C-alpha cells in the first residue's frame, strides 16, 4: 500500500482531551485501521506540529477521507502528504526522460 505522512496539530479541545485522556491517541489508531489504513509509526513532536504519523492506505481517496473525517471533529488540524520511497523515486528518475533532455546516463 502507498505510504502517507500525517502531520497533526491539536486545536480547540484537542489538547485538553489528550491531557485528560492520553489513550485517546491509541483509540484513534483503531479508527484508522477500521477504514483500511495501517499506522506504521507515530511520533509526538515539538514545534508547529504535535504528531507525525506514518501510515499506509489503499489510495489517495481513502487517506483524504480519513483526514477530513478526523479533522471534522474540531480537535485536530491535519496536513497529509504522500510519501515516495527514495529508491523508487531515483529509479523512476533514471527510467524516464527528464524535461526534454533525453534519458539519464547510467553510471
Where do the language-model regions lie?
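Intrinsic disorder/low-complexity signal
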Residues: 30, 49, 55, 68, ...
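An amphipathic, aromatic/His-enriched active-site/gating alpha helix that lines ligand/cofactor pockets
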Residues: 57-87
Amino acid at each position: 500500500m502507498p505510504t502517507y505522512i500525517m502531520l497533526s496539530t491539536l486545536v480547540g479541545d484537542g489538547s485538553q482531551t489528550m491531557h485528560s485522556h492520553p489513550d485517546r491517541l491509541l483509540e484513534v489508531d483503531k479508527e484508522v485501521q477500521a477504514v483500511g489504513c495501517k499506522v506504521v509509526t507515530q511520533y509526538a513532536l515539538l514545534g508547529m506540529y504535535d504528531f507525525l504519523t506514518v501510515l499506509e492506505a489503499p489510495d489517495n481517496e481513502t487517506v483524504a477521507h480519513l483526514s477530513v473525517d478526523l479533522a471534522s471533529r474540531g480537535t485536530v488540524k491535519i496536513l497529509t502528504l504522500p510519501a515516495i520511497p527514495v529508491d523508487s523515486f531515483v529509479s523512476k528518475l533514471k527510467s524516464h526522460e527528464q524535461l526534454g533532455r533525453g534519458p539519464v546516463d547510467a553510471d
